């Protein structure tokens, strides 16, 4: 699963997920899956969506993952009293903002790509839309 190789600090504050995304265009492939709402997407969810797409296109074409889980989420163990510091890192998330491009694909028929994106979107906790590349 995706996670940073090394970070400056082990734990991070919760923070807020506000604003709009900057990576909102289809940059690498022909068609992209774009987030419509905001969420915290875990590394497991990203991997699950990637596997669903890869299996549907039968390992043809090329898939780009445009999000990376770089924020650690901590959790204290069960039945532990409050206090005594912050819990250990449980999993990693990517903070998704509206308009962010999640996945891109090319090299396969458009109908198959749309079906693959539909399978991937079912595994994600965010509403999505499919965007085609516009050539200027």
From Swiss-Prot:
This is Large ribosomal subunit protein uL16. GO terms for molecular function: rRNA binding; structural constituent of ribosome; tRNA binding. CDD domains: Ribosomal_L16_L10e. Coiled coil: none annotated. One of its GO terms (biological process) is translation. The gene is rplP. It comes from the Bacteria. Belongs to the universal ribosomal protein uL16 family. Binds 23S rRNA and is also seen to make contacts with the A and possibly P site tRNAs. Part of the 50S ribosomal subunit. Pfam families: Ribosomal_L16. Disulfide bonds: none annotated. Gene3D superfamilies: Ribosomal protein L10e/L16. HAMAP family: Ribosomal_uL16 (MF_01342). It comes from Ruthia magnifica subsp. Calyptogena magnifica. GO terms for cellular component: cytosolic large ribosomal subunit. PANTHER family: 50S/60S RIBOSOMAL PROTEIN L16, LARGE RIBOSOMAL SUBUNIT PROTEIN UL16M. SUPFAM superfamilies: Ribosomal protein L16p/L10e (SSF54686). InterPro entries: Ribosomal_uL16, Ribosomal_uL16_bact-type, Ribosomal_uL16_CS, Ribosomal_uL16_dom, Ribosomal_uL16_sf. The keyword Transmembrane does not apply. Keywords: Ribonucleoprotein, Ribosomal protein, RNA-binding, rRNA-binding, tRNA-binding. Transmembrane segments: none annotated.
